[in-house]
Curated annotation (Swiss-Prot):
Gene3D superfamilies: 3.30.300.20
Functional summary from the UniProt entry: One of several proteins that assist in the late maturation steps of the functional core of the 30S ribosomal subunit. Associates with free 30S ribosomal subunits (but not with 30S subunits that are part of 70S ribosomes or polysomes). Required for efficient processing of 16S rRNA. May interact with the 5'-terminal helix region of 16S rRNA.
Chain intervals for the UniProt region annotation (Disordered): 119-142
Listed GO CC annotations: cytosol
GO molecular function: ribosomal small subunit binding
Official protein name in the record: Ribosome-binding factor A
Locations listed in the record: Cytoplasm
HAMAP family referenced in this protein's UniProt entry, alphabetically: RbfA
């Protein structure tokens, strides 16, 4: 039976926390700006780590520039994190842009827009929404 948390998963979680702190506090590169570390996948032999990051930018060129800046500083970031973690081998860092947060926000906005459009159409045609029907029933019970 496998352990609930494998060693690589524990290391990935600690690496994610340390990377987030280093990127927020120690990185002074203005090209990077505010970055969020969403996830870290560490290879089984601990030689590589894929670091999934998100920026508050939607422009693809800016995102590519920020990822390139992180990749260029990967050695420096790796050395800062290595000083904080007790590992014999510090994984080589590869930064990857994670668009899931931006896509999730986009989908949420689309759903909200569709709901508000439906409610507006229902009001135009005189159809009560579920919330309005509940209010009418409550008033009739009194």
């Amino acid at each position: 039976m496998a352990k609930e948390f494998s060693r690589t998963r524990r290391i990935a979680q600690q690496l994610q926390q340390e990377l987030a702190q280093v990127l927020q506090r120690d990185m002074k590169d203005p090209r990077i700006g505010f970055v969020t570390v969403n996830d870290v996948d560490v290879s089984r032999d601990l030689s590589y780590a894929k670091v999934y990051v998100t920026f508050f930018e939607e422009d693809e060129k800016l995102v590519e520039q920020k990822v390139a800046a992180l990749d260029a500083a990967a050695g420096y970031i790796r050395s800062l994190v290595a000083g904080r973690m007790k590992l014999r081998v510090m994984p080589e860092l590869r930064f990857i842009y994670d668009s899931s947060l931006v896509e999730g926000m986009r989908m949420s906005n689309l759903v909200s827009r569709v709901i508000s459009n439906d409610e507006a159409k229902q009001k135009q045609h005189g159809v009560e929404t579920d919330a309005e029907q509940g209010e009418t029933k409550d008033e009739g019970d009194k």
